[in-house]
Structures are given as structure tokens and as C-alpha cells.
Amino acid sequence: NTNTGLSSESFYSAITLTNDARLNHCTIIHNNAPGICAVDGQLRLYNSVLWGNTSTGIIAPEDVQITGSATMLDIRNNAIQNAPEEWNLWSENMQLSVVQGDPLYPAFVNPTRNVGAVSSGYDTPLGGPARFEPTCESPLVIAGDESIVGDPDLALDADITGHNFAVGGAPDIGAYEATCLNPVGSVLYV
């Protein structure tokens, strides 16, 4: 789902959690605040991407994507731009780059084909919605792992648009499955 809102609360973020939360295959990007603020409770986050959430309006490597004081964190197999170092997330998660061309830069489908879209790929003031499905070159592709979820209620077999996961192997990280891969698993040369 797409969510838009304004907040001046002290714990502002794209998603503010005050209780236990279990999230799988979420795409939380390009918000004018940290992506998640886990104020209290337990946060279980899997196969999700948090990138480009910034309080300054300019994406920078030091922008914190997850913040808060949750009582328990289980954050595995995600692609995250930055998080507090004391959370020690980098052994089980991918740390994304903000530098275009870097292998860990999360390339998304370019929405400039829409009328009124701009080259940043995020703002479409006169046209259709931005498309945040990963491109085939993105590190998010075939990087998901449903086996770590451990909860049948969170296990998914399709993305937010209905495309089946695991096209070409493992599912992609995030809410969208890349559609550039051949859905039947064979290559046709012409």
C-alpha cells in the first residue's frame, strides 16, 4: 500500500511502532524522516528495503533508516542504507550505498516514461506513480530468504502487485519482485 501523511510528533518516521510488529517484504523508501521508529515492543523485520529516508531532503550515507528503543530486535535479510552501529545489523543484512553505479546501490525501475516524471525517479508531479520495483542490476534481486521468517502468517508467495516470488530462484528483497526476469525460467535467444 502507499501511505502519505504529515507529523510533527517527537517520534516521527514513515512508520512509528509502539507495540510488537512483524514485517516481511516491505519497501520503505524516500520519506522525509527515518523509515522506522521502533519506540517500544519487539520489531521483527525480514526481506525489506529501507533506503533514502532522510530528514534533510538530500540522501546522504549517514541518514538513519531505523531508530528507536525497541525491547527486542530481529532484523534479518534486509537491505538497509544505515542504522545505529550498536545494533550490529551488518552481519545478517545488506548495507546499501547512496552512490549510483556502486554494486550496492538499489537501482529501481525508472519512472521517467510517465508524463511529467523527473529524472530523480521519485517525483511525478504531473504523471503516474513512481515505480520502485528493482531493476535486474539491483542487489535486491534474488536476495530474499523466506526460510528465516519462521511464521507461516508472514510467508508470502507474491509481491504487492501479484507477481510470484522466486522467479529465477529466491524472492527479491522488498515489496516488489523484479519483472525483468523470464517468468518461466528458460532463455529464448532470437
Residue ranges of each PLM-predicted region?
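Predominantly extracellular beta-rich ligand-binding scaffolds that present long acidic/polar faces
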Residues: 1-137, 150, 182-183
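Short, amphipathic alpha-helical segments that act as regulatory/interfacial helices
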Residues: 79, 175-177
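Active-site and glycan-interaction determinants of carbohydrate-active enzymes
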Residues: 126-173, 180-182
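Boundary/junction segments of secreted and surface-exposed precursor proteins
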Residues: 181-190
